[in-house]
A protein has these predicted regions:
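Single conserved hydrophobic/aromatic residue that forms the stacking wall/gate
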Residues: 1-20, 372-373
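Catalytic or ion-coupling anion/metal-binding cores of large enzyme and transporter domains
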Residues: 21-320, 325-344, 349-371
């Protein structure tokens, strides 16, 4: 699931990591005039020449890291590239592990403890992962009957530093992690930095600490992982806020946001395509808080709205506005983005009552969001 772009794409069009989101970004940018249709089509043809999912810390790999950290995947399974010969050996190990689990009567609920969920949350936070991981963790906790909530994630995200330079926040990919030893090296690094609970049982039949006992530290000279003292950020790129706009919570991804506080005037939309048109017509200005609603689970199955966040990533707006929604966003989205706003608009959540011009403020480290005048 790792891509390398073909030759011939202009360096200023496609730089760094190549992902399956590039075609969507290019289409959005072409729609608002930030690149030509010809340039967009060139990216669509050449950005994704290989099989699999994108190789960055977006939704796909966020969940892979979470599952390995929670103990439901064999060591290194989440970081072996899709077309690597090691995948066949991994499949053979899975068969043997299944037999071992059956013989020892180890069941999912023996592994899925509160501590295991904390390990998963810490790992995706330290890796700079996607907000979609929050949805999956909470859904799995509910299914397993484990008391682990958005409030727990809020505390973890506040206290977990970012120790990895995965794209989209940095230049590295999962293939880079694979080259330095895979996900076990990342997890051993987190364990050595006091961030993981090594006593948790895993699908190997051993504890997490036992699985990682012989894993070496990150090799000298690598630039993917840093120590806790030299962290990229003292708190996670994901943060959770509550307030009169989101009484049941809203999840932020703010990797490119320097100030954890933001205040701006609402500009409201009910369709992501209207945001693309508004950007094209220059109707959105710096300092705005873009509200996109009626896209939650009840309203429309909670779709991903990358076309909207991609359109807002034009230079004159990038890092200068906030985006709030009851929808989901892609893990490659960047900026000040708050999603999963609850209650959603379709069930009468406060986000449905927002009007253009309303003043909205949020403070990520205080965990608060709200309308200035209620």
């Amino acid at each position: 699931f790792f891509f390398q772009a073909e030759d011939g794409i202009r360096d200023d069009l496609v730089t760094g990591v190549q992902t399956c989101a590039l075609p969507i970004y290019s289409q959005a940018k072409a729609a608002v005039g930030a690149m030509t249709q010809e340039e967009s089509q060139e990216i669509i043809r050449k950005a994704c020449p290989g099989p699999g999912g994108c190789g960055i810390a977006a939704s796909f790999n966020t969940w892979g890291l979470a599952m390995e950290a929670i103990g439901l995947m064999l060591p290194a399974s989440s970081s072996i590239p899709a077309v690597d010969p090691e995948k066949r050996a991994e499949c053979r190990r899975v068969g043997a592990a299944m037999v071992n689990l059956l013989q020892r009567n180890i069941r999912p609920r023996d592994i899925l403890t509160v501590a295991a969920f904390r390990n998963a949350a810490v790992t995706i936070a330290a890796a700079g992962g996607s907000t979609n991981g929050v949805l999956h963790i909470l859904a799995l906790a509910r299914e397993a009957g484990v008391d682990f909530t958005l409030r727990d994630l809020q505390q973890i995200f506040r206290s977990t530093p970012v120790l990895a330079s995965f794209a989209p926040r940095g230049p590295r990919t999962m293939v880079d992690l694979h080259h330095i030893g895979g996900t076990p090296v990342l997890m051993k690094h987190l364990l050595d930095n006091g961030l993981l609970d090594g006593s948790c049982l895993t699908v190997t039949g051993q504890t997490l600490a036992e699985n990682l006992r012989d894993v070496p530290p990150p090799p000298a000279g690598q630039d993917l992982l840093v120590s806790r003292e030299n962290c990229y950020k003292p708190f996670a790129d994901m943060q959770v806020c509550f307030g009169n706009l989101a009484p049941e919570g809203i999840v932020f991804k703010v990797s490119s946001m320097k100030d954890p506080r933001f205040t701006g005037r609402a500009v409201c939309f009910d369709d992501p395509r209207d945001i693309v048109r508004a950007v094209e017509q220059r109707r959105i200005t710096p300092g705005s808080v873009i509200i996109l609603r009626y896209l939650g689970p009840v309203a429309s199955g909670m779709p991903e709205v990358l076309i909207a966040t991609a359109a807002l990533a034009v230079p004159e707006l990038d890092g200068k506005i906030a985006f709030l929604s009851d929808a989901r966003v892609s893990g490659v989205s960047h900026g000040a983005i708050g999603v999963h706003c609850a209650p959603e608009a379709a069930v009468g959540g406060p986000i449905a009552c927002e009007e253009d011009g309303d003043e909205i403020s949020f403070d990520l480290l205080e965990g608060e969001i709200g309308r200035a005048h209620v």
